[in-house]
């Protein structure tokens, strides 16, 4: 059962509203997102390129770009080594195009998810050595590649690291000892000594900051680097970074540019998904376009996605984009099968575990993270999904707020051949013989309580469903872009009746309702969740007959509470308010 609670953060909402020309409702919503003080509020509402932080504040950024300038002037061969997800693809694109623009002799390599696994490895290093590569620059990986970078250095190569992942460490007697590779320069805002004001950049944003400095040193107008902002925004949302502070500005500015994008690949991907560039929002990055990019790295090679953005021929770009859309459709089908298998395993034997470890040897290893996310959502427990690979077992984990997944993996790192990640997500490789040992140890170390497993729904503001009007709903758009750490406002109302409920949609998976308030006002509502579960919930609570009456549009005794977001429904030139139900009781 979910636990609903109202966020109560105090402020002079009337004063804020007056100073910024907004409603007290919007002022409260901004405060609920942790934004305090006039300067921070102004930055939240209107922050633009001028408010971005100085890239030179990134530790080693000056040194790394000095090395690049020297290598470019000497025409040394440079290779970008990225990653196979959306952030890795966009990071690689930015570095490759940026270094090329500066006159560098540069190529790129993206690891094969199945053969290479995550990030730089000895195989890729030896390939680079055989190709006469002088300098390797990583993006969205490299911070944990201590041994691999030592190998590259032993072969005489220069190694530059740009990354955003957690810094690896060992722990002795409660004290952390952070590891650092032999790389010639490392740019990662998470380094302890780095004074960069914002630590939550994605890999593509770090790469872009490097290119900004490189352009300046190569006498290229820094404004040219703004062309990459659509890629940075795409990666920031696609890699599920917090949409706070600088990330909020990066995504906002990137969305402006994508609405008029001239990149044939980006336009083709948008059009193949039956959208227009001016329609694109952060939602489309995360749930429509992004999965197409990730599908190439999961089922084929991420080079397909990268080549899409490098493509200058419109017809060819359209063909590649169509291939990516098809791959994503295949991925969806395979994911559904994997989720079903995983839930069976959980229900048959793992329900008592605080941390779920699901071993699915025959499931495609690239789908482990998605499946883990779905199981985490269903069970509200930290979840690892492991699959069989060529060299042992690989897996991905997805966590809940109370559980820092990367820190917990550090407690049993001796079991892994490789691991890394964030508080909310992680990846790991281990011998098959260690799977059960891992299951036991990760649970033995777990300090979660029963309270931690209860999903918590944070309500921004209680508000009657008939209160929001069109001007207020339009004003709420000031809070965009929405995403992690800047979710759509969660508004709640209670004691609502159901005048009518109708199941619609091609797959009969959308519920349209007419709700009635205690004051007799009617409001249109829509619910995109599990319709059968909705019926069963109210059937248990009020009886199946009452539910049947509601679906027939007849008088019934059902009363419901909802968490919702108001939207404008446009139909045949008319506008009306419709609420989108997120949760119900």
Question: What are the residue ranges of the model-derived segments?
Answer:
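Catalytic domains of riboflavin
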Residues: 1-3
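Hydrophobic helix-and-loop "lid/oligomerization" segment in the mid-to-C-terminal part
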Residues: 7-135, 155-156, 173-176, 182, ...
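Short helix/loop capping segments that flank catalytic or ligand/cofactor-binding pockets
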Residues: 89-90, 147, 170, 245, ...
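Short, well-ordered strand-loop elements centered on a beta-strand within folded domains, enriched
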Residues: 175-178, 183-186, 391-399, 522-526, ...
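Mid-to-C-terminal polyanion-binding domains and interfaces
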Residues: 70-74, 316-322, 326-359, 411-585
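Conserved beta-strand positions in the Rossmann-like core of class I SAM-dependent methyltransferases
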Residues: 107, 160, 538
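Active-site cavity-forming subdomains of large catalytic enzyme subunits
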Residues: 126-204, 208-217, 227
């Amino acid at each position: 059962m979910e636990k609903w609670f109202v966020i109560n953060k105090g402020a002079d909402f009337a004063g804020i509203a007056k100073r910024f020309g907004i409603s007290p409702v919007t002022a409260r919503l901004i405060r609920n997102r942790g934004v305090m003080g006039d300067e921070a509020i102004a930055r939240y509402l209107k922050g633009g390129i001028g408010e971005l932080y100085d890239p030179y504040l990134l530790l080693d950024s000056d040194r790394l770009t000095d090395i690049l300038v020297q290598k470019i002037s000497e025409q040394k061969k440079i290779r970008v080594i990225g990653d196979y997800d959306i952030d890795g693809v966009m990071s690689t694109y930015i570095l490759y195009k940026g270094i090329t623009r500066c006159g560098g002799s540069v190529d790129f390599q993206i690891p094969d998810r199945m053969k290479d696994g995550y990030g730089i490895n000895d195989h890729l290093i030896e390939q680079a050595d055989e190709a006469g590569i002088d300098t390797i620059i990583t993006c969205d990986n490299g911070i944990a590649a201590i041994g691999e970078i030592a190998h590259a250095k032993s072969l005489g190569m220069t190694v530059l690291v740009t990354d955003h992942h957690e810094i690896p460490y060992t722990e002795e007697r409660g004290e952390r000892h952070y590891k650092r590779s032999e790389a010639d320069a490392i740019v990662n805002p998470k380094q302890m000594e780095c004074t960069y004001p914002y630590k939550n950049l994605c890999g593509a944003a770090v790469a872009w900051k490097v290119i900004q400095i490189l352009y300046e040193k190569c006498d290229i107008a820094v404004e040219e680097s703004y062309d990459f902002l659509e890629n940075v925004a795409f990666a920031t949302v696609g890699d599920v970074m917090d949409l706070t502070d600088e990330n909020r500005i990066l995504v906002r500015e990137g969305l402006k540019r994508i609405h008029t994008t001239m990149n044939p690949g980006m336009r083709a991907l948008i059009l193949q998904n039956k959208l227009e560039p001016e329609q694109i929002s952060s939602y489309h990055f995360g749930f429509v376009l992004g999965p197409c990019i990730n599908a190439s790295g999961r089922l084929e090679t991420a080079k397909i996605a990268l080549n899409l953005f490098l493509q200058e021929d419109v017809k060819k770009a359209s063909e590649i984009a169509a291939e990516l859309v098809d791959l994503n459709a295949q991925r969806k089908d395979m994911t559904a099968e994997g989720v079903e298998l995983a839930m069976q395993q959980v229900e048959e034997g793992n329900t008592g575990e605080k941390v779920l470890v699901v071993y699915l040897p025959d499931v495609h290893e690239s789908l482990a993270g998605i499946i883990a996310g779905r199981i985490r959502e269903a069970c509200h427990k930290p979840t690892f999904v492991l699959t069989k690979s060529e060299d042992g077992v690989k897996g991905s984990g997805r966590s809940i707020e109370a559980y820092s997944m990367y820190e917990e993996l550090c407690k049993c790192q001796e079991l892994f051949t490789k691991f890394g990640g964030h508080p909310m997500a992680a990846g790991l490789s281990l011998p098959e013989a260690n799977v059960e040992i891992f299951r036991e140890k990760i649970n033995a170390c777990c300090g979660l309580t029963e309270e931690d497993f209860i999903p918590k729904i944070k309500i921004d503001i209680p508000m009657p469903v008939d209160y929001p009007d069109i001007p207020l709903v339009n004003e709420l758009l000031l809070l965009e872009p929405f995403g992690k750490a800047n979710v759509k406002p969660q508004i709640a109302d209670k004691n609502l009746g159901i005048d009518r409920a109708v199941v619609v949609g091609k797959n009969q998976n959308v519920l349209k309702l007419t709700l009635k308030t205690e004051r007799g006002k009617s409001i249109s509502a829509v619910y995109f969740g599990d319709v059968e579960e909705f019926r069963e919930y109210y059937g248990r609570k009020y009886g199946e007959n009452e539910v049947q009456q509601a679906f027939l549009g007849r008088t019934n005794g059902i009363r419901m509470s909802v968490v919702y977001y108001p939207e404008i429904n446009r139909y045949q030139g008319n506008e009306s308010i419709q609420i989108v139900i997120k949760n119900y009781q």
